[in-house]
A protein has these predicted regions:
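Conserved N-terminal segment of class I S-adenosyl-L-methionine
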Residues: 1-107, 125
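A structural motif
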Residues: 57, 135-136
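A short, conserved alpha-helix within the catalytic core of class I
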Residues: 119-135
C-alpha cells in the first residue's frame, strides 16, 4: 500500500500532537487534561452497530484511533461489552501517527472520527486517498 505524504506543516502538526500526548495540555481555566482519551465512536454505537451488521463488517481500521480501546470492557454501558464484542468484530487495527501506531491494512470498514478537522487543507486529498486504499 502506498503511504501518504504530509506537507511540512502537516508534519509539524503531528509533532505537536506527539508532544500533547506525552505532556498533556492545559485548558483555558488551567484544568489539566490528558489528550487522546475519548472513544469518539461510543455515542453513535447503536447506529454503527446496525450498519456493521447490514454490511457484515468483521474487520475495522480505526484511522486516527487516539485513545480508543476496542478491547476494554464497558464500551456499552448496558451490556458492559467491549467495542470489539459489541460490534461482533474479529479484527481491529489502528492508525495514529501522533501515537506512533501504524497497523494499517485492508479492512472491511475504515472509521475516522475527530480527525479531518485537525488536518491542513493541503493534506486532506492525500489523507483521504490513504483512507480509501484500506477500505475493502
Amino acid at each position: 500500500m502506498k503511504k501518504y505524504k504530509l506537507s511540512k506543516k502537516g508534519n509539524q502538526l503531528i509533532n505537536m500532537y506527539n508532544k500533547m500526548i506525552d505532556e498533556g495540555y492545559f485548558k483555558v481555566k488551567a484544568e489539566e487534561n490528558l489528550s487522546y482519551v475519548n472513544f469518539e465512536i461510543r455515542p453513535l454505537r447503536k447506529n454503527i452497530k446496525k450498519i456493521f451488521k447490514d454490511y457484515n463488517i468483521k474487520s475495522v481500521l480505526d484511522y486516527g484511533s487516539g485513545g480508543s480501546d476496542w478491547n476494554k470492557s464497558g464500551f456499552d454501558v448496558e451490556t458492559e461489552k467491549s467495542a470489539k464484542q459489541y460490534f461482533e468484530l474479529d479484527k481491529i487495527n489502528k492508525f495514529d501517527p501522533a501515537m506512533n501506531v501504524d497497523e494499517r491494512c485492508l479492512s472491511d470498514c475504515v472509521v475516522c472520527f475527530d480527525v479531518l478537522e485537525h488536518i491542513f487543507i493541503s493534506d486532506v486529498r492525500n489523507l483521504l486517498l490513504d483512507i480509501f486504499q484500506y477500505a475493502n
